[in-house]
Amino acid sequence: MAAAGRFGLLLLIVLWTMVTVVLPASGEGGWKQSRLGTEAAVMEEERCTVERRAHLTYSEFMQHYAFLKPVILQGLTDNSKFRALCSRENLLASFGDNVVRLSTANTYSYQKVDLPFQEYVEQLLHPQDPESLGNDTLYFFGDNNFTEWAPLFQHYRPPPFRLLGTTPAYSFGIAGAGSGVPFHWHGPGFSEVIYGRKRWFLYPPEKTPEFHPNKTTLAWLLEIYPSLAPSARPLECTIQAGEALYFPDRWWHATLNLDTSVFISTFLG
């Protein structure tokens, strides 16, 4: 519990010490943000209780993970072209005038707001305020116009695994450091980080987590996580750029973007 408390404190300090600036484009695609006078990235905890598997076979996936537990996939696809297209400069040039639909970052995401993609990136894409509620925080994820974004999505190579009777559907998103979606559940799928880092917290369907649906994941991490007994802790891990997390059907999960993050999920509906 002491380690969890230190993690939360470090996260809060790094997120909210000084003024945010966007670093020049590099290996982070121009998305990386920092704060003057602080470390360049949000601290992460080393704890990881989700298996990482490189070059997993379909047989192994079906036998050990598909209906049983999450797994982090490495080395299954090459999305270097898609990643290059997702740089800040390229996305603004290609889709800056497109109207995107933002959702509130709470469990039920009731509120929707439409505005130009460039306005979202330049004015709303900033680190999460720890005092803000999830239902007051706007977040670009999920509601994609597949016709308008098809020139981008056609270059994405999803993990090659499918479940019988399901059809894949993409959900593309970009969010600021410290943002995320609190605990919720839905059908199975994969979530790949293109730029940045995203921390996941997961519970099996039969174990409902303690959380407030309108509070942010950051608030949960600072207020509830440190007091959890070891037996009550979720499975958790930080997904790095180029990795994809598989989550089985109806698993509870919450996410926390440790950097400004670009990500895409493949839902198996």
From Swiss-Prot:
The keyword Endoplasmic reticulum applies. GO terms for cellular component: cytoplasm; endoplasmic reticulum; endoplasmic reticulum lumen; nucleus. GO terms for biological process: positive regulation of canonical NF-kappaB signal transduction; positive regulation of sprouting angiogenesis; regulation of glycolytic process; regulation of pyruvate kinase activity. Residues 147-269 form the JmjC domain. Residues 1-24 form the signal peptide. GO terms for molecular function: cis-regulatory region sequence-specific DNA binding. N-glycosylated. The keyword Lipid biosynthesis does not apply. SUPFAM superfamilies: Clavaminate synthase-like. This is JmjC domain-containing protein 8. It comes from Rattus norvegicus.
